[in-house]
Design a protein with these regions (language model features):
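Glycine-rich active-site/cofactor-binding loop and its immediate structural neighborhood
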Residues: 118-151
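Oxyanion/phosphate-interacting regions
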Residues: 25, 30-47, 210-213, 230-297
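N-terminal subdomain of lithium-sensitive/metallo-dependent phosphomonoesterases centered on the IMPase/IPPase/PAP
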Residues: 28-123, 210-213, 271
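Acidic beta-strand-loop-alpha-helix segment within the catalytic core
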Residues: 140-230, 277-297
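Residue-level signal for inorganic ion chemistry
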Residues: 56, 79, 90, 126, ...
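Low-acidity, Ser/Thr- and Arg-rich intrinsically disordered low-complexity segments
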Residues: 4-10, 14, 19
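Conserved acidic residues
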Residues: 115-117, 149, 218, 238
Length: 297
């Protein structure tokens, strides 16, 4: 069953921007799938993400102390606290699955990777977090044979989370205490007559602007972090072009949610974005340019 298709298509870019800025939920009529073993696994990751979000919000309220990594990107105590919480939860529940986590990699800890591994970004959108905006997220994804098969994204400042696995995607409403209050299934929409494009708030490039102009994308909304994937998955936007550097942990969880909702993420050759670690160091974990989108047919 399509989710509020006609209403979504009628939204203007300014109205969408207001809804996004205010964290207004979009109603859907899909029912929640039955819980199976995979769902029970993702519930564990979801709880880890919620716990990490609580730690992040504690730092958010107190005001973050900012330091800088070797690549000059910012890092805060919130990043480090959140990652510790997630790594402990994953090690306790899934000790045999290796984890690639952003802050650990920055400190030189890259585990041996098997066919299955976790990708963790404890705080995606650190710049937005430091600036006092609300579009930062906690991200946990499971990769199997290069494919993001399941993921959870949590936006603690908005009280919203998204999960995706095996063609089932959900949006969760979360209390300020980190408890799940409601959940409903979501689905990406087919491309609207006037498509809405989501653009990185902090990394919009000349190549992105050229793509927008070439494809006649007149309705563009700037959004930070992996929220862009989740908004595509919800069916409130249509396309997210990314032509600047991202790392696998930035995209995997949101990509998993989008794929579970019926969307897709393609590299510039038209192949599904692959999460395959080739080579050594951080460069081996970098993504190529990509385009994420909702349903195309």
């Amino acid at each position: 069953v399509a989710a509020s298709g006609s209403t979504n298509k009628a939204q203007t870019a300014s109205a969408l921007a207001d809804r996004i800025a205010n964290g207004v939920p979009v109603p859907h009529v899909l029912t929640r799938p039955e819980t199976d073993k995979g769902s029970r696994m993702i519930e564990i990751w979801t709880q880890a993400a919620l716990d990490a979000g609580q730690a992040i919000m504690a730092v958010h309220k107190a005001g973050p102390n900012v330091s800088y990594k070797n690549d000059c990107s910012p890092v805060t105590e919130a990043d480090q606290r959140a990652e510790t919480i997630i790594l402990e939860a994953l090690a306790r529940n899934f000790p045999d699955i290796p984890v690639i986590a952003e802050e650990a990699v920055s400190n030189g800890a890259v585990p041996e990777i098997a066919e299955q591994f976790f990708l963790v970004d404890p705080l995606d959108g650190t710049k937005e977090f430091i600036a006092g905006k609300d579009d930062f997220t906690v991200n946990i994804a499971l990769i199997r044979n290069g494919v993001p098969v399941a993921g959870v994204v949590y936006a603690p400042c908005r009280g919203q989370a998204w999960t995706g696995e095996d063609r089932n995607a959900e949006k969760l409403t979360v209390s300020t205490e980190g408890a799940i209050e409601a959940r409903h299934a979501i689905r990406a929409r087919r491309r609207a007559a006037s498509p809405v494009a989501l653009i990185s708030r902090s990394h919009c490039t000349a190549k992105t602007e050229a793509f927008v102009a070439e494809h006649g994308l007149k309705d563009c909304v700037s959004v930070g972090s992996s929220l862009k994937f989740c908004l595509l998955a919800e069916g409130v936007a249509d396309i997210y072009p990314r032509f600047s550097r991202t790392m696998m942990w930035d995209t995997a969880a949101g990509d998993a949610v989008l794929r579970a909702a019926g969307g897709r993420t393609l590299d510039c050759s038209g192949r599904p974005l692959a999460y395959e670690v080739k080579g050594e160091g951080e460069d081996a974990l970098a993504n190529p340019d990509f385009i994420a989108e909702g349903m195309t047919a």
